[in-house]
Amino acid sequence: MTAGGLARMLELVEIGDDSFIGPPNGPAGKRAYGGHLAAQALAAACRSTGSDRVPTAAHIQFLRGGDAGVQSRYQVERVHDGRTTSSRRILGFQGDRLLLSGTALFAVPTTGPAHTDTAHTDTAQTDTAQTGTAHTEDPDALPRTGPIGPAPALPAVEVDIRVHDERSGTAEFVRRLWWRVIADLPDDPVLHACLAVYVTDIYGIDPVLAVHGHSMTDGSHHAATTDSSTWFHRDIRADRWNLLECRSPAAARGRGVMTAGLYDASGVRVATMVHEGQAVKRER
């Protein structure tokens, strides 16, 4: 398949002075997908940075919900450009409404210590009663589940998602979300990094609820990501299998945290992600 809608969502139009317009990706009146906004914000920051440096971190704070059918404008501030590093600040708007504030860090790749942990598949205890399937390290052997609920921003014809949950309803809950973009993509590490941010925000706070036996799809809680942070360790290939291994170490006061490692198919950690979000019980 040739590059599809997801890649086109990251084709921003520069309107001058490090200001960019990003296309919408959904019906008017529906809530904009946070991963869409975060990925476009990172793409805007990348457009203002030299091609010799790659993103090392992106931090996005979601301030207001957006409209999925409305284009967004991203204003980038060049905070710092050093010999090997750069820093950018990004503000995201729809009209005059400020939707997000973020920062992105960049660096020229250099030599230094290199190590990685591996996904914790070897210690996982399968809960076949809950999942109906044994855990496997081969994503092709898992059923093609798609996201855990409706996700119009991630069309099934473009993104293959296979979710395997373990120990639901306990503090040891683990979500293993295998994903890949089913499209021909150019060898552009910036595009692949932005696509990783785009895809991995899907139901990003759900592990917070899953620890307690709930889900973002059951209507028991108002849940939404308020802060998304990603540290990029190595180049990501969005068009190959990637494993997002998610846990929730803490929740209190109506908020919770999801931490995750993003691994390539060989088990090497390519990124680390932390999402914070609201998880407020609905009054029946």
List each language-model region with its residue ranges.
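Terminal targeting signals and extreme-terminal segments of soluble enzymes
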Residues: 1-284
